Amino acid sequence: MSGRRSKESEDQVPDIVEVNVTVPDGDERQAALAELEDALASVPAAGYAEVWVDHDSFPALCLLVNGEHGWLMCLRYSGDAGFSSRNPAYVGDPDATLEYYLSNGQRDVYPVAWAYPRERAVEAVRIFAQSRRVPD
């Protein structure tokens, strides 16, 4: 993961919704997909969230949410440095950044150019959960 990180004091950490869903291949698959939909619906429109979806550990996709923005990171296997989203449609300030919070309170800061609109990032999570692949 690329990005600057700093640990904030406990009184400065905002509320963060944490979602962890494993999508198995067997009979429990549909229940896991329904659980994911319910969890995604619980993320407040103006808040922060850390969402992890995996398929029996790997591959795994992480979505960090800050309001109307979402940043994605895919891990293919244990120890993978992973790869993260870049939004080729971004036309704003190249130095602009967004902060995200992990469920443990850690604050990460990434370029806004790496974020997608929240709904597009959430749709990528849905596609990954259903197909085991990261959408184009």
Regions found by a protein language model. Name each.
Residues 1-119, 123-136:
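Acidic (Asp/Glu-rich) sequence patches and key acidic residues
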